[in-house]
Regions:
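Solvent-exposed soluble domains appended to multi-pass membrane proteins
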Residues: 1-287
Length: 287
């Protein structure tokens, strides 16, 4: 759960920012690729195919990168793993990302075994120098440390394991929580870097989860949450946050998903857009 003791930086964003309390991640056979694409385009994907790969060669003039690029922002995107499964190095530029950096371009060590995932702290360390000195930047980062598996030993699954000894959770849950500590540290480093560069008050940070931790059983997840994930597909409820240090906190309880993120951000930044071309809603509007 999101608490100040274990995850002070995530808690800060969630408790001091705009938090979406009934946000859900669509479930399909390509959760990460499709839901990332949905966030970037505000379009629904095809649930039985990896839409982001099948249509990677299309151009997307209304995608988030192009919209902010047209508004005068420098655009770039980053991921701390390889492109074995998702073709970000193709589709991101076609959406308007001027530069896409994967783990190899960032000189982050990674494994091809899909077991040892890199540290998101390294993602922040290596990515921020590429954009932090720009006057106006729009950046998309895809983190990876918290990914499954949780049932086997791993570097970051075990790194903070002892810190959760007081909790009566399964080892798999504790490994997930250990990995979350690394993500929390990465967010803390990002906040620190922005503040040191005098950019924090003028930066909006949006965070969403592409899917629930399906490497855990529903039974395991129920030991942590205060609601039953087996009821009404509550297991698919995931956090979504928009944070700016100078913006008052707000809890939004209407039902949302990442498809609503782009229209909301375009409204926040007063970017001219045609809402007929987006399937999501501006969450600050009445609907």
């Amino acid at each position: 759960s999101i608490n100040e003791k274990e995850y002070p930086n995530i808690y800060k964003l969630y408790s001091e920012g705009i938090s979406y309390r009934n946000n859900y991640s669509p479930r399909n056979n390509c959760n990460t690729g499709n839901n990332e694409m949905t966030a970037m385009t505000s379009l629904f994907t095809i649930n039985n195919t990896c839409t982001a790969d099948k249509y990677k060669n299309n151009v997307y003039p209304e995608a988030i990168f192009n919209m902010f690029k047209n508004a005068g922002y420098t655009t770039s995107s980053y991921h701390d793993y390889a492109d074995f499964y998702y073709s970000r190095k193709i589709i991101h530029p076609n959406m308007g990302s001027s530069n896409y950096y994967n783990a190899s371009r960032l000189n982050i060590k990674w494994s091809s075994l899909y077991a040892e995932w890199p540290s998101d702290v390294d993602l922040i360390k290596t990515a921020t120098p590429h954009f932090i000195n720009e006057d106006k930047f729009m950046v998309f980062m895809t983190s990876v440390t918290t990914h499954q598996p949780y049932t086997v030993s791993s570097e970051y699954g075990d790194k903070h394991l002892s810190e959760f000894s007081e909790y009566n959770y399964s080892t798999a849950v504790k490994r997930y929580m250990s990995k979350m500590k690394e993500l929390d540290a990465a967010i803390g480093l990002l906040l620190e870097t922005l503040e040191t560069s005098s950019k924090l008050d003028d930066t909006v940070i949006a965070v969403f989860g592409d899917h629930y931790p399906y490497g855990l059983t529903n039974k395991d997840i129920n030991t942590v949450l205060d609601y039953d994930v087996n009821v009404d597909k509550e297991v698919d409820r995931t956090p979504m946050i928009i944070y700016n240090s100078a913006t008052p906190k707000e809890e939004i309880t209407k039902y949302t998903t990442m498809i609503d993120l782009l229209p909301t951000l375009l409204n926040m930044f007063d970017v001219d857009y045609d809402p007929r071309l987006y399937l999501g809603h501006d969450t600050f509007s009445e609907y």
